[in-house]
Amino acid sequence: MMINIPRGTQDILPAETAKWRYVESKLHNIAANYNYKEIRTPMFESTDLFARGVGGSTDIVQKEMYTFKDKGDRSLTLRPEGTAAVVRSYIENKMNGDANQPVKLYYNGPMFRYERKQKGRYRQFVQFGVEAIGSENPAIDAEVIHMVYNIYKSFGLKHIKIVLNSIGDMDSREEYKQALIEHFEPHINNFCNDCKNRLHTNPMRILDCKVDHEQPTVKTAPKITEYLNDYSKNYYEEVKQYLDLLNIPYIEDASLVRGLDYYTHTAFEVMSEAEGFGAITTLCGGGRYNGLLEMLDGPKETGIGFALSIERLLLAIEAEDIQLDVEESVDIFVVTMPETVKEAVKIVAELRNAGIRCDMDYLGRKMKGQMKQADRIHATYTVVLGSNEIETNKIQIKAMQTGESETIKLQDIASYIKGE
């Protein structure tokens, strides 16, 4: 029986990997423009990292993690998100002692969640994210949101919106939590079992429940902005002032709460409004986390970051019918005769060593078939290598797009292609 790909995963084939490389390269360059440095963490971590860092009451920890025991009977989990692992690395490697504060990091790699498969959502997916750790300053919150805005604009996306909210500090959230309990408790029997279980542990999760988000009592629930203390209000106002200064458009939504327990103060999402994008409109989410490092037994440092889905970014680009300049061509295809194959192998190797992208026939095709192959792989030039060309040390190089040919020396192929 044929073995198929696991459910909820995908093969990214050569026709698509060019787009992925283009997108990821641009993301790396944008992060570098903001002085963020790349960090790479393991794809699996101690399960306790996510239970404590992400939050035991979240859907991720309760339902979506891929957890297993290793041969040493240790509980390990394939990472479902990037922030907790980056913060763990920051603490473990004592980056808070670095004079270059805040520490600005970015990551790019696969994450794993056991979710129901649908368009734009996979069980293995790729996230690009940034974390700025060591500064509690509204200006760096604005910097992170500015980077997000520039990322989507750099791909030519027009139908996006930034949704912004503050979920306050821990004191504000505690007061808000009590207000939510009082609001939902008389109606809790109308809610799903998850919401019932979360009423007294984390009632904010009820607000973004995937089952009950249309409940009337959810829509009439008190807003976090009504419970912000003076510090939280002032912090939020300063963030908005910086965003206005940077001409970044945003929409305030007091019902926005992020699905992870570690968020405080600034919370934001980027949504696609493009027709045909699909039911899942969130492209990116992020926010500030002022207590996460202490929750993981780290120093009293604060951070802010975001994570975006590469898959959903590509879907948004497709939905807006944006063509990426990613056509990959071969510089030259060497057409061979049976008697010149060995010489062609040598010439092709020399061209590759000179930095020329080239290929040749390995199936013994006739000349016509080789020319068709050159066309299929979008070769810029072709040369036909026969015994006469080897004897005279001269060859005709043909531009495939125009059909024009020019006679040059064999040893000059590389410099001709480079325009030297």
UniProtKB/Swiss-Prot annotation:
It holds the Pfam family tRNA-synt_His. Disulfide bonds: none annotated. Gene3D superfamilies: Anticodon-binding domain, Bira Bifunctional Protein, Domain 2. It catalyses: tRNA(His) + L-histidine + ATP = L-histidyl-tRNA(His) + AMP + diphosphate + H(+). One of its GO terms (biological process) is histidyl-tRNA aminoacylation. Its main location: cytoplasm. GO terms for molecular function: ATP binding; catalytic activity, acting on a protein; histidine-tRNA ligase activity; transferase activity. Keywords: Aminoacyl-tRNA synthetase, ATP-binding, Cytoplasm, Ligase, Nucleotide-binding, Protein biosynthesis. It is found in: Cytoplasm. Its EC number is 6.1.1.21. InterPro entries: aa-tRNA-synth_II, aa-tRNA-synth_II/BPL/LPL, Anticodon-bd, Anticodon-bd_dom_sf, His-tRNA-ligase, HisRS-like_core, HisRS/HisZ, HisRS_anticodon. NCBIfam families: hisS. Belongs to the class-II aminoacyl-tRNA synthetase family. This is Histidine--tRNA ligase. It comes from Macrococcus caseolyticus (strain JCSC5402).
